[in-house]
Amino acid sequence: MDSGSSSSDSAPDCWDQVDMESPGSAPSGDGVSSAVAEAQREPLSSAFSRKLNVNAKPFVPNVHAAEFVPSFLRGPTQPPTLPAGSGSNDETCTGAGYPQGKRMGRGAPVEPSREEPLVSLEGSNSAVTMELSEPVVENGEVEMALEESWEHSKEVSEAEPGGGSSGDSGPPEESGQEMMEEKEEIRKSKSVIVPSGAPKKEHVNVVFIGHVDAGKSTIGGQIMFLTGMVDKRTLEKYEREAKEKNRETWYLSWALDTNQEERDKGKTVEVGRAYFETERKHFTILDAPGHKSFVPNMIGGASQADLAVLVISARKGEFETGFEKGGQTREHAMLAKTAGVKHLIVLINKMDDPTVNWSIERYEECKEKLVPFLKKVGFSPKKDIHFMPCSGLTGANIKEQSDFCPWYTGLPFIPYLDNLPNFNRSIDGPIRLPIVDKYKDMGTVVLGKLESGSIFKGQQLVMMPNKHNVEVLGILSDDTETDFVAPGENLKIRLKGIEEEEILPGFILCDPSNLCHSGRTFDVQIVIIEHKSIICPGYNAVLHIHTCIEEVEITALISLVDKKSGEKSKTRPRFVKQDQVCIARLRTAGTICLETFKDFPQMGRFTLRDEGKTIAIGKVLKLVPEKD
């Protein structure tokens, strides 16, 4: 303590440390220094009892606290950091990714340079602890606080869909040297880092699709509750809030519909995300919007999914509305197939409704209408589709067998998911990570699902199509920090060497030795699903391929393909119409990343949309080199 800036700039970690410091080293001047000097002369017990005053200006001594929480962290916009919880650890985590402050061990000597950023710890230290008591857990259990301090802005993209990036609110200003240290190192916490050798549960992405109001978000919320990811108290709070808005049957969906607009209207807009685990697998729920205005968002969700759950309302009138021409049941099932989803679980929901009352006749009626359509889309009724009745609101047949439907002999929903065979994913394939979103948080963070290959911390990668060289600074797999990830995992990767503004959704992270293909012109095979008039060369639409959305023009029609025999016509067609299959040449407005369907199916399937409707689905056959 050689600076004369007064000891309000810093505080001893404990009373033992005060005893160790010589009386002469205390700064002279105000009442603060006299209080410290007085404390040094007194026995511990009397000093403690005399000084226990929550209104005291210098500090409130607390013998159980190993460290102090900086007072500037109490602002509402700042995420919580670790308070005195990690107890006996005598390490000072400096520059290890704690953007909001440093932890100090109980017996560690305090250097003056490290003390100064701990601005005025004020007497209301107990108040600080109280304010931070919710997000901070007991000693050693630091996962939640660590997660939030590493990436507070991810809350907007996932937990609060629809918001802008909150990364700009940023951490408080620190010295240049500390900022550099924190950028170069990611947190090293034993409680969060998963060792690369540890056995991992298989990651499975499940997208919930179906017509608006079928009950997708409610089922998602019920799963979160039944698997312990949302506690009873939180649900009771949602129920109270929903009742106040006369929306009491919507409260379960609020676990996934987190923004105010979605709650007020009862409609999912963004793709909500949540996680749950079974004995064998780790699942990510992608709750896709059902309204036709938000189909592009639904396509983004389906492109990341391994498995689709088509939610159908059994309520009289609702099933028919969702399934007829204008409904989203048909379009969603078709888009899920186009996005590469192999398995489809059809949940016939709202079986508890008075118009249905767990009627097997109604269940079979819905099933009979759906099977021919799903077969036409490309799902095999025997291998790819599984039907089950349920009630999202009551939770019947979600986790446990329901007494209301003794006629259903299969497994309930969650046990069925747990017993699915493993998805065979190659860890040796080329690295392909399509970017879904990006934001700033102590650098550039990108979000996406690793389609193939494996990524480790410190690895050098290339961002395509711009060929930016980047370095992996840190990896979060479903909000858990790790050093190594395998295909199928949902990742947040912090990158060095690229700015957030230089990345767009649809860009791909690749291995420098095995880059993905990129271009603007390519030949495709397309099936015209729905279009009233004929389609000729020069027709413009919107292309959805993996996570990329781009304007596209059909520049040429090459041949028609016979649906039954697969034979191609000898002459070039002048136009194509609904239900026809053709080979065509497409040209995008900008350069995009893509692969042929034969080489890499996940990046070779696409959808064409126009005027809010899916007009065609297709696959990439060949990339055409650009003419100089």
UniProtKB/Swiss-Prot annotation:
Renumbered residue ranges of the record's region G2: 266-270
Q: What is the effect of changing residue 55 to A?
A: Impairs interaction with UPF1 and PABPC1
Give me the ranges of the annotated region G4. 349-352
List keywords of the entry alphabetically: Cell cycle, Cytoplasm, GTP-binding, Hydrolase, Nonsense-mediated mRNA decay, Nucleotide-binding, Protein biosynthesis
* Bias type Low complexity, positions: 1-10
- The set of disulfide-linked cysteines is none
The record's region (Disordered) falls at 1-49, 72-124, 146-195
Q: Where in the cell is it found?
A: Cytoplasm
Give the matching Pfam families. Answer: GTP-eEF1A_C, GTP_EFTU, GTP_EFTU_D2, PAM2
Q: Which family does the record claim for this protein?
A: Belongs to the TRAFAC class translation factor GTPase superfamily. Classic translation factor GTPase family. ERF3 subfamily.
Q: How does it assemble?
A: Component of the eRF1-eRF3-GTP ternary complex, composed of ETF1/ERF1 and ERF3 (GSPT1/ERF3A or GSPT2/ERF3B) and GTP. Component of the transient SURF (SMG1-UPF1-eRF1-eRF3) complex. Interacts with UPF1 and PABPC1.
Its biological purpose: GTPase component of the eRF1-eRF3-GTP ternary complex, a ternary complex that mediates translation termination in response to the termination codons UAA, UAG and UGA. GSPT2/ERF3B mediates ETF1/ERF1 delivery to stop codons: The eRF1-eRF3-GTP complex binds to a stop codon in the ribosomal A-site. GTP hydrolysis by GSPT2/ERF3B induces a conformational change that leads to its dissociation, permitting ETF1/ERF1 to accommodate fully in the A-site.
Name under which the protein is recorded: Eukaryotic peptide chain release factor GTP-binding subunit ERF3B
Organism, by scientific name, is: Homo sapiens
As recorded in Swiss-Prot or TrEMBL, the protein's gene is named GSPT2
